[in-house]
């Protein structure tokens, strides 16, 4: 026989962003607890609202599985004394297992006998094991915690109820002075205390007090209600997944409704309106069937439809206050002068250890100009990059960005166009923030991409120079994101700019405001981002080998990694890698700058390898380069079959090492082949 277990923890309102993660964490920890305690089960269901986290275990065994464990002890010669009696070592061993010497048996392992005991432990009843469930609750981790009343124990929010049912039987447990029972709380305003009759009636019991505890059902209710509004009003609603997930975790009983605002606010840029509605008020944006913004919004109430008219009016009033701010800043900011704003950036601190935003922009401008020489820009693009790098942060001092910081760059583009700047310049101002997340959109224009690269590169080098380096998960200045952006942009635009040379050049640029340092740490940090971009689908040995190459051009490195993955599936890969590894390992013994003297060759195989290396140009894409290199395998094999490298004649030995080094210098532009796994 099996039973179903219900565990519900009732709390004060949780922050929306932790609800789903906490629900999943509770489910995982309950599953681990049951497995560790040998309580079998069929499946686990999880539930959550802003005021509760819950788990239902389906098909929970009534008893633990019996435990039979074998323990190996000392060898027989240690376990028995000279009289054939059990020694103190043997007695201590069995006593530590809660047994007596009667349980001892001897088993032979690799020709020697050892003490073994078998321990039998009968399974406990599920109810007995479940008394430790509070330990699961106390083990939950949260990004923020608090303590309340006289509790020294910190938790995400104060705990109000604990419900633990095994079918219809309430278990007698305590957690943070809260005694378990069958009582749960209903909706804060519409519901009341409710008795959970049975683990199986959990959802239906809570529905009677206006709580939809299944997040999937709550989400579907929201979507269905929005769909009904779309049909009734002949409109289209932007369903932003992140916003939907947030709203889902703000309500226990959702009711969607549509509100309106004055048409005059549509004269304000759409991004301002969308930001006001979505980011600040958690409203869904409404459009007509052609995609044009309408003076409407969709919100979701935490409650039913009673007095919904009052709720709509209240939400409209709050939104209008936001839109008034947006309209005011839009009009006032247009009176500002870009050059005046740029001049004032000298008084804005980028970081107290690094200097002002003006100094950051000045360095960025020099780096951008240096990058422009590497990628080939038209005269028009060069002029646009030069102008954009002079002014690109000006919008940080506008009223709009001061109020809505999410619009930095976006408003810069709009104000730049209004001030008569070219479209190239304006676009670059917006795009220099991209990508703003690991999977975020990339710049589409060359000018924007170069400005983004230069800005991110100076940010990285500057913070490293003053020892503000990320450690562990701590990255307050988002340097990992900035560096990931650098790598993604280089890959997307196919710009094979050697990163090591680029960083070296940056360190040599003349800046009065800051001296870059920590070059090795910077390169290691960039390598970690390239490694992450390769992804776990690329085996670690291939990632390591490519990262150790001498050709630090991001697009080529990523392409080479993929080419080696493909090659590793071929029949000749293992042999080719083994022989190249041998070449690399021997070449490490060569002099610092070995010179090849063909007069010292003693056999045809040396000459053949020399000619093959001379003809090896590694042209084409990465796949073709790998194929060209692996094509030398037979020549390398013949060389090693007929040639001893480490001979007594120093001149001959060094000449052969020089020959191998010449192959390494070419092969290493792809990868450090002796780091590859050939097994």
From Swiss-Prot:
It comes from the Bacteria. GO terms for biological process: arginyl-tRNA aminoacylation; glycyl-tRNA aminoacylation. PROSITE patterns: AA_TRNA_LIGASE_II_GLYAB. It is an enzyme of class 6 (ligase). InterPro entries: DALR_anticod-bd, Gly-tRNA-synth_bsu, Gly-tRNA-synth_heterodimer. The keyword Ligase applies. Disulfide bonds: none annotated. Transmembrane segments: none annotated. Pfam families: DALR_1, tRNA_synt_2f. SUPFAM superfamilies: HD-domain/PDEase-like (SSF109604). The keyword Metal-binding does not apply. It is found in: Cytoplasm. Its main location: cytoplasm. GO terms for molecular function: arginine-tRNA ligase activity; ATP binding; glycine-tRNA ligase activity. Its EC number is 6.1.1.14. Tetramer of two alpha and two beta subunits. Belongs to the class-II aminoacyl-tRNA synthetase family. This is Glycine--tRNA ligase beta subunit.
């Amino acid at each position: 026989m099996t039973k179903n277990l219900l565990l519900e923890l009732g709390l004060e309102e949780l922050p929306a962003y932790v609800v789903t993660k906490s629900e999943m964490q509770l489910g995982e920890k309950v599953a681990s607890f049951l497995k560790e305690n040998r309580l079998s089960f069929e499946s686990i269901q999880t539930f959550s609202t802003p005021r509760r986290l819950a788990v239902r275990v389906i098909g929970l065994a009534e008893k633990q599985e019996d435990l039979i464990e074998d323990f190996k002890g000392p060898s027989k010669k240690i376990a028995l004394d000279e009289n054939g009696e059990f020694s103190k070592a043997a007695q201590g061993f069995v006593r530590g297992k809660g047994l007596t010497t009667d349980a001892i048996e001897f088993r032979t392992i690799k020709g020697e006998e050892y003490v073994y005991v078998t321990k039998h432990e009968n399974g406990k009843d599920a109810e007995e094991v479940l008394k430790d469930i509070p330990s699961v609750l106390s083990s939950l981790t949260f990004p923020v915690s608090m303590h309340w009343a006289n509790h020294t124990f910190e938790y995400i929010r104060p705990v109000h109820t604990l419900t633990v049912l095994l079918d219809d039987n309430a278990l007698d447990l305590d957690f943070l002075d809260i005694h378990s029972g069958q009582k749960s709380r209903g909706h804060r305003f519409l519901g009341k205390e409710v008795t959970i009759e049975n683990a199986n009636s959990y959802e239906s019991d809570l529905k009677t007090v206006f709580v939809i505890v299944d997040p999937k059902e709550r989400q579907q209710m929201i979507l269905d209600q929005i769909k009904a509004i779309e049909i009734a009003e002949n409109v289209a609603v932007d369903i932003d997944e992140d916003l939907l997930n947030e709203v889902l975790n703000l309500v226990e009983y959702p009711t969607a409704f549509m509100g309106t605002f004055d048409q005059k606010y549509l004269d304000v840029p759409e991004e301002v309106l969308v930001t006001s509605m979505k980011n600040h008020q958690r409203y869904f944006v409404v459009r007509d069937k052609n995609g044009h913004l309408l003076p409407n919004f969709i919100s979701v109430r935490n409650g039913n439809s009673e007095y919904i008219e009052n709720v709509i009016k209240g939400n409209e009033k709050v939104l209008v206050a936001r839109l008034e701010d947006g309209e005011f800043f839009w009009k006032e900011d247009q009176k500002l002068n870009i050059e005046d704003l740029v001049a004032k950036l000298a008084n804005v601190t980028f970081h107290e250890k690094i200097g002002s935003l003006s100094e950051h922009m000045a360095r960025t401008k020099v780096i951008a100009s240096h990058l422009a020489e590497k990628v080939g820009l038209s005269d028009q693009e060069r002029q646009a990059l030069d102008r954009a790098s002079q002014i690109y942060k000006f919008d940080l001092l506008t009223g709009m960005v001061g109020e809505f910081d999410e619009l930095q760059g976006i408003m810069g583009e709009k104000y730049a166009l209004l001030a008569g700047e070219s479209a190239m310049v304006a676009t670059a101002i917006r795009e220099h923030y991209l990508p703003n997340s690991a999977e975020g959109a990339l710049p589409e224009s060359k000018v924007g991409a170069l400005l983004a690269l230069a800005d991110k590169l100076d940010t990285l080098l500057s913070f490293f120079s003053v020892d503000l380096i990320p450690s562990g998960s701590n990255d307050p200045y988002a340097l990992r994101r900035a560096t990931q952006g650098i790598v993604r942009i280089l890959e997307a635009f196919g710009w094979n700019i050697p990163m090591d040379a680029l960083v070296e050049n940056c360190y040599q640029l003349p800046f009065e405001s800051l001296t870059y340092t920590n070059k090795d740490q910077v390169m290691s940090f960039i390598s970690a981002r390239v490694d992450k971009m390769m992804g776990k689908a690329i085996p670690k040995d291939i990632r390591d080998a490519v990262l150790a190459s001498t050709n630090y051009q991001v697009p080529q490195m990523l392409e080479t990694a993929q080419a080696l993955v493909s090659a590793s599936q071929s029949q000749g890969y293992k042999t080719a890698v083994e022989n190249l590894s041998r070449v690399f390992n021997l070449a490490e013994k060569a002099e610092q700058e070995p010179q090849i003297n063909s007069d010292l060759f003693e056999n045809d195989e040396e000459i053949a390898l020399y000619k093959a290396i001379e003809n090896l140009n590694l042209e084409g894409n990465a796949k073709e380069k790998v194929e060209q290199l692996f094509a030398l395998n037979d020549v390398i094999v013949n060389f090693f079959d007929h040639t001893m490298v480490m001979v007594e004649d120093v001149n001959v030995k060094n000449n052969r090492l020089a020959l191998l080094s010449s192959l390494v210098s070419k092969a290493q532009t792809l990868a450090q082949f002796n780091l590859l796994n050939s097994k």
